[in-house]
């Protein structure tokens, strides 16, 4: 998993509350377990005018030229609600997003973001509203998300502070998913297995 330290990038605006996981990545695209290849289907029903995904909807915000290459998504309350599907953060990350800024998230989606190397930042509703205004009126300006300092710096330099669990922060900062965390204990696991073989050898008789 790629470490998350400081993200300095274009922020795209999605001015919709209660965006559910079926809107993030529709169910017909959940036919594989690899984490790549989902970005093209992100927000499919909003991004495209046809089922085949060949005609872009010019009215959808992410299709605007100003948001090309965006790595930060700023959106509204209760983002990621609906059914539990890890494909939702996969699709967002595969599209290019590394951080999301919103007033609130659905719990399962929130947890899945951390497990997949993406930072879901929670700011107050009025702070998100201010960022919406600043980003919309400063075309080409970038937003900075600093995990170490736990800050978001807006286009005009104003700083917003956010909270993050210390363990999740450690994992993101060091690029550790569940497998990576387990591998860090590989030597201790080996020591345990060695002792267990001596005490309970029948467990390894196969």
Swiss-Prot record:
Keywords: Amino-acid biosynthesis, Branched-chain amino acid biosynthesis, Leucine biosynthesis, Lyase. This is 3-isopropylmalate dehydratase small subunit. Heterodimer of LeuC and LeuD. It catalyses: (2R,3S)-3-isopropylmalate = (2S)-2-isopropylmalate. The gene is leuD. Catalyzes the isomerization between 2-isopropylmalate and 3-isopropylmalate, via the formation of 2-isopropylmaleate. InterPro entries: 3-IsopropMal_deHydase_ssu (IPR004431), Aconitase/3IPM_dehydase_swvl (IPR015928), AconitaseA/IPMdHydase_ssu_swvl (IPR000573), IPMI_Swivel (IPR033940), LeuD (IPR050075). Its EC number is 4.2.1.33. GO terms for cellular component: 3-isopropylmalate dehydratase complex. Pathway: Amino-acid biosynthesis; L-leucine biosynthesis; L-leucine from 3-methyl-2-oxobutanoate: step 2/4. It holds the Pfam family Aconitase_C. Belongs to the LeuD family. LeuD type 1 subfamily. The keyword Amino-acid biosynthesis applies. PANTHER family: 3-ISOPROPYLMALATE DEHYDRATASE SMALL SUBUNIT (PTHR43345:SF5), 3-ISOPROPYLMALATE DEHYDRATASE SMALL SUBUNIT 2-RELATED-RELATED (PTHR43345). One of its GO terms (molecular function) is 3-isopropylmalate dehydratase activity. It comes from Leptospira interrogans serogroup Icterohaemorrhagiae serovar Lai (strain 56601). GO terms for biological process: L-leucine biosynthetic process. It comes from the Bacteria.
């Amino acid at each position: 998993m790629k470490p998350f330290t400081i993200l300095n990038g274009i922020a795209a605006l999605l001015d919709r509350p209660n965006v559910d996981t079926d809107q993030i990545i529709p169910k017909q695209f959940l036919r594989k377990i690899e984490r790549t290849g989902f970005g093209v289907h992100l927000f499919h029903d909003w991004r495209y005018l046809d089922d085949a995904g060949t005609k872009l909807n010019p009215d959808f915000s992410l299709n605007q030229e100003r948001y090309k290459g965006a790595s930060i998504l700023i959106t509204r309350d209760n983002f990621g609600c609906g059914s539990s599907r890890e494909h939702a953060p996969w699709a967002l990350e595969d599209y290019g997003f590394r951080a999301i800024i919103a007033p609130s998230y659905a719990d399962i989606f929130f947890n899945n973001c951390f497990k997949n190397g993406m930072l879901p930042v929670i700011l107050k509703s009025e702070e998100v509203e201010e960022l919406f205004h600043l980003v919309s009126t400063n075309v080409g300006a970038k937003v900075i998300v600093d995990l170490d300092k736990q800050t978001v710096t807006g286009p005009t330099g104003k700083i917003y502070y956010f909270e993050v669990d210390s363990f999740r922060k450690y994992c993101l900062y060091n690029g550790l998913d569940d497998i990576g965390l387990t591998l860090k204990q590989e030597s201790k696991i080996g020591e345990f297995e060695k002792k267990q073989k001596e005490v309970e050898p029948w467990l390894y008789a196969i």
